[in-house]
């Protein structure tokens, strides 16, 4: 993947995540642009380029699937959940106060 593709993916992800919030979207655009501008003069064979592009793609994926904005509407908040928002099944929440084993012999939350 090229830096240009990663840049575009990141800008689109910011637009999806922060749609309707001009101040936050502008700040995200400026931060993304600044980060890419700082590295624009690196030689094509620089070993730091590939990890930086991978990081940009990971951030874009995170923004699309894990950032949800809420707006206060009276005494409640309305969440703007979109088609890319990751929705978990909350299986561990449904178990309640039981001891949950994750991966090994240790109990969850030092229980």
Curated annotation (Swiss-Prot):
Subcellular localization: Mitochondrion matrix
GO biological process entries: mitochondrial respiratory chain complex III assembly
Assigned GO CC terms: mitochondrial matrix
Keywords for the protein's UniProt record, in alphabetical order: Chaperone, Mitochondrion, Transit peptide
Gene Ontology molecular function: any one: protein folding chaperone
The keyword Mitochondrion belongs to this UniProt entry's keyword annotation: yes
Major site of localization recorded for this protein: mitochondrion
Function: Assembly factor required for Rieske Fe-S protein RIP1 incorporation into the cytochrome b-c1 (CIII) complex. Functions as a chaperone, binding to this subunit within the mitochondrial matrix and stabilizing it prior to its translocation and insertion into the late CIII dimeric intermediate within the mitochondrial inner membrane. Modulates the mitochondrial matrix zinc pool.
Family named by the database record: Belongs to the complex I LYR family. MZM1 subfamily.
Subunit architecture: Interacts with RIP1.
Annotated protein name in UniProt: Mitochondrial zinc maintenance protein 1, mitochondrial
Organism: Sordaria macrospora (strain ATCC MYA-333 / DSM 997 / K(L3346) / K-hell)
